[in-house]
Amino acid sequence: MPDSTKIERVETILWDRWLLIRIHCEDGTVGIGEGGVHGWQRPTKTMVDTMAEYLKGKNPDYIEHHYQWLYRSSHFMGSGVQGALSAIDIALWDIKGKRLGVPIYDLMGGKTRDKVRCYMHVGGTTKNELVESAKGAVAEGFTAVRFTPFPPDYYLHKSYTEWADEAVDRVGAVKEAVGGDADICVEIHRQMAPAESIWLGRRLEQFNPFFYEDPMLPDSPARMAQVADQCNIPIATGERFTTIFEYEQLLEANATSYIRPDLCLCGGLSCSKKVSAMAEEKHVKVIPHNPLSPVSTAACVQLDACIPNFALQEYTGESEPPKSDLLITPLKLVDGYLMVPEGPGLGIELNEVALSGPENPKVLDTPIGFDGSVQDR
């Protein structure tokens, strides 16, 4: 074990639409992290800057201690607090791995796999565009695709029957296009009530989706459990959760087949590892949520590599700017699998030139229904 060092400073970087952090130690070691969710990077940055005052001069090895101190001292929790804690946790694990010269997964029980199966986001305004997007992903080697089965304006000017029929038609078209070469993953974005979720889910059973994600809001495990019980499709949910206690309620209710921890929101690698163990006890598998930057992807791969109940990894593509510019050596993607890196810590380093790029924050918005009412995003 190398001699102990102390945290010298915490750097926050608003880059494009993401919040990255670097924790600098006195011995020169720098840990990289990411935190926050779309639209809330600036408040999360403020939380990291506030927490940095506590971290200065502390030993970076005490990862769980620092998490507990900052979590318990916050009194009022939420996505801002947990997003900041997530970024700090990931960066501290990166520091520990770099100082010991090993990947993070080696510090969390060791590697359980050499590569990580990914599902690719596909989409399109029309059914034909959606089908072609799915076929393109399969041609690139992906064995799972994820999509929302309706156009952006479905909730504005259509009856439930009309857009549900359209959803069934689109799911069927994608299934026919990819056949047995790829699994299909259906994302609903919390747009339905429980009864509607059950009705549509039953209609989609014929296409054998890998999962049926967030058909309703995830804030009622009991109601989600009713959907899970009455649909013969695996439910996936949990991307909005910020603590292990929310996952505990979900799992105890038998409300899901797959949990979707967001490492940049629910407490970083530490809490995601705990949640994965909780899920393992229930024979529930893990599909990490990952809509952010390649730093988030790198953290997800470290988790995926060391848990036995990993199922799939969300992947939005990182071959185009600005994402392709962020890392000096990007993670290697081969036939729809991310290869588990062997380098220390997260196994990545940031490209300083790319970091000079401007902030491009996501604009907060949510749909307005045909009657003028606010809809969920």
Which residues are covered by each model-predicted region?
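Structured beta-strand/loop patches that form or line metal/cofactor-binding pockets in enzymes
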Residues: 1-32, 36, 318-324, 373, ...
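Extended hydrophobic packing segments that form well-structured cores
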Residues: 346-377
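Metal- or metallocofactor-binding catalytic centers and their adjacent structured scaffolds
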Residues: 24-100
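Shared catalytic-loop signature of beta/alpha-barrel
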Residues: 49-53, 65, 202, 208-211, ...
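Glycine-rich phosphate/pyrophosphate-binding beta-alpha loops
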Residues: 14-18, 30, 34-40, 85, ...
